[in-house]
Swiss-Prot record:
Protein name stated in the entry: Isopentenyl-diphosphate Delta-isomerase
Keywords: Cytoplasm, Isomerase, Isoprene biosynthesis, Magnesium, Manganese, Metal-binding
Species name: Corynebacterium glutamicum (strain ATCC 13032 / DSM 20300 / JCM 1318 / BCRC 11384 / CCUG 27702 / LMG 3730 / NBRC 12168 / NCIMB 10025 / NRRL B-2784 / 534)
Gene3D superfamilies per UniProt: Nucleoside Triphosphate Pyrophosphohydrolase
SUPFAM superfamilies assigned to the protein according to its UniProt record, in alphabetical order: Nudix (SSF55811)
Gene name, Swiss-Prot/TrEMBL: idi
Length: 189
């Protein structure tokens, strides 16, 4: 029995792919720049899925964050990677998403957690609509707990207590275009 190794795509400072490395070896105190994605999932009522990272996670354990993050594999589009992670992380079906919009295509961040582990990612941010009748059943090793939040209430909580949330969520939600896209999607419901 063989286990497939999840690879992440490494990047140079210009955002060009320069190779791959096993995901298990990438996140260290000297993390190389690599490709990732970040998602904000809206249910049919226009509420945002906010997740609390599993306590067993290597980086930022137990921290509240956006709906889902991940890494596209070699030759995998972000949309395909989002669908894959929706299955692997949130227990969704591969066709659970109605719409995947890239809102912040050039988002990049570097953050260091309390243990010294670095996240350094080219990480486009996506807004995703969940189909009617779909239910989130997160895997325990990925998500400790989750909540569906009205967007403005989440924005207010992030503004008042940013230390409760992941640094990438706080930074991403400081972008007016992301907040606007989320509010427009919420108001459309």
């Amino acid at each position: 029995m063989t286990t497939e190794v999840e690879l992440v795509v490494l990047a140079d400072s210009e955002g060009n792919p320069i190779g791959t490395a096993p995901k298990a070896t990438v996140h260290t105190k000297d993390t190389p720049l690599h490709f990732a994605f970040s998602t904000y999932i809206l249910n049919p009522r226009g509420e945002l899925l906010v997740t609390r990272r599993a306590l067993s996670k290597k980086t930022w354990p137990g921290v509240w964050t956006n709906s889902m993050c991940g890494h596209p594999g070699p030759d995998e589009t972000n949309a395909d990677a989002i669908r894959r992670r929706g299955v692997d992380e949130l227990g969704l079906e591969v066709d659970s998403f109605l719409d995947i919009q890239e809102i912040l295509p050039d988002y990049q961040y570097r953050a260091v957690d309390a243990s010294g582990i670095v996240e350094w990612e080219l990480c486009p941010v996506h807004l995703v609509r969940l189909a009617v009748g779909e239910f989130v059943e997160p895997l325990d090793d990925e998500v400790e707990e989750f909540e569906w939040a009205e967007p403005q209430k989440l924005f207010d909580a992030v503004d008042a207590t940013p230390f409760v949330f992941s640094p990438w969520l706080v930074d991403q939600l400081s972008a007016p275009e992301l907040r606007q896209a989320i509010l427009e999607a919420f108001d459309a419901e």
